[in-house]
Amino acid sequence: MLERLKAITNLLKGALEQRSRAEEGYIREEKVKEAIELLEALERDIMEKELKLAKEALEKFDSNRKFYYLVGKLYVEVSKEEAQKLIEDELKMFGGEGK
């Protein structure tokens, strides 16, 4: 993840360092597009990491506890099994593995 942040920083610095006015707009637009792609990939990486951590934490709790899952802006009470399935489904959405 740190490598992606460094790449974004360097990309944006490079876009600002362009000298030619004719090329400046086009080059900056391309650099911004590249930066957006890197940021989106970083966002997926972070989300996948958070989901994996949640999955690991969930496995440490017994089924007698109450579990809550954030759905939109609501926390919904779910069973341990439901929480595990929801996390696995989200991991698949972000390109991670469910198990």
From Swiss-Prot:
Where are the coiled-coil regions?
A: 3-68
Keywords tagged on the record = Coiled coil
Q: What is an annotated GO biological process for this record, any one?
A: protein folding
Q: What GO molecular function terms would the record report?
A: unfolded protein binding
Keyword Hydrolase among record annotations: no
Superkingdom of origin: Bacteria
Q: Which GO terms describe its cellular component?
A: prefoldin complex
Q: What name goes with this protein?
A: Uncharacterized protein aq_754
Organism of derivation: Aquifex aeolicus (strain VF5)
